[in-house]
Curated annotation (Swiss-Prot):
InterPro entries: UPF0178. Signal peptide: none annotated. This is UPF0178 protein Shew_2726. It comes from the Bacteria. It holds the Pfam family DUF188. Belongs to the UPF0178 family. It comes from Shewanella loihica (strain ATCC BAA-1088 / PV-4).
Length: 150
């Protein structure tokens, strides 16, 4: 299993959790972004910088992700694409996207987009708090443990 991170939108606190997990579990974590960012020196952590543009980083993640890999993203269409390839998708709040729930989540996202386009103020998600960080860390640990038991 490799971990791919949609890094442009991933909160720093979540990246920090991923960096610690990479070292602890000796698992490859690759951040994909359209701008340079700091990463800790590690043989398990790397940054792939892609050109700017709509969905360029997403397309690179879809291209590289393989069945059994884990993709960290809040981008629901990206999650849907990698799930179709057999990868797992986890959002920064600890919610695991699966083939069983991704279609309904994608439908809700599309509905909210339609509402916003018609002028309805829907607001955005709250900042990531301690409970979301804990949920993410717990779900990540479960997935890594499951992978290592194979």
């Amino acid at each position: 299993m490799k971990i791919w991170v949609d890094a442009d939108a991933c909160p720093g606190v979540i990246k920090d959790i991923l960096f610690r997990a990479a070292e602890r579990a000796e698992i490859a974590v690759t951040l994909v972004a359209n701008h340079a960012m700091r990463i800790p020196p590690s043989r398990f952590i790397q940054l792939v910088t892609v050109s700017s543009g709509f969905d360029v980083a997403d397309n690179e993640i879809v291209r590289r992700a393989a069945p059994g890999d884990l993709v960290i993203t809040a981008d629901i269409p990206l999650a849907s694409e990698v799930i179709d390839k057999g990868a797992l998708a986890l959002n920064p709040r600890g919610e695991l996207y699966t083939e069983h729930n991704i279609k309904s989540i994608l439908n809700m996202r599309d509905f909210m987009d339609t509402m916003r386009a018609s002028g309805v103020q829907t607001g955005g998600p709250a900042a990531i708090g301690q409970s979301e960080k804990q949920a993410f860390g717990n779900q990540l640990d479960r997935l890594i443990t499951k992978y290592h038991k194979r």
